[in-house]
Amino acid sequence: MSNIYDTANQIERELRELDEFKALQAAYEEVKADEAAYTLFKEFQGFQQGLQEKQMRGEEFTDEDAEKAQSIATKVQETAVINELMQKEQAFSLVVNDLNRIIMTPVRDMYND
């Protein structure tokens, strides 16, 4: 029997070869090539991370957080290359979600006996 971590590493290598990953990678390169879009994307990522950290600490979101989220979301929606990146990320996430569903089958089966 092979080592499960060897299998996981093989899956990681195969994910990099998927069309969905290659499309995501190409879309990210397009964002990076557009300085304004890349700056906005990094701001968006940082803001999202900050909100997640706030949520994990049990802090409430402020009106200022909501206003900034709306402002950044509007700018992101108006930026075609970022929208394309998000679409490609969503397509790749579907593959990852399918893999997670498959991997978690033993646990689901156990609880559904």
UniProtKB/Swiss-Prot annotation:
**Which source organism?**
Enterococcus faecalis (strain ATCC 700802 / V583)
**Pfam families found in the cross-reference section:** Com_YlbF (PF06133)
Q: Which domain of life is it from?
A: Bacteria
Q: Which family does it belong to?
A: Belongs to the UPF0342 family.
Gene3D superfamilies (UniProt xref): YheA/YmcA-like (1.20.1500.10)
Q: What is this protein called?
A: UPF0342 protein EF_0681
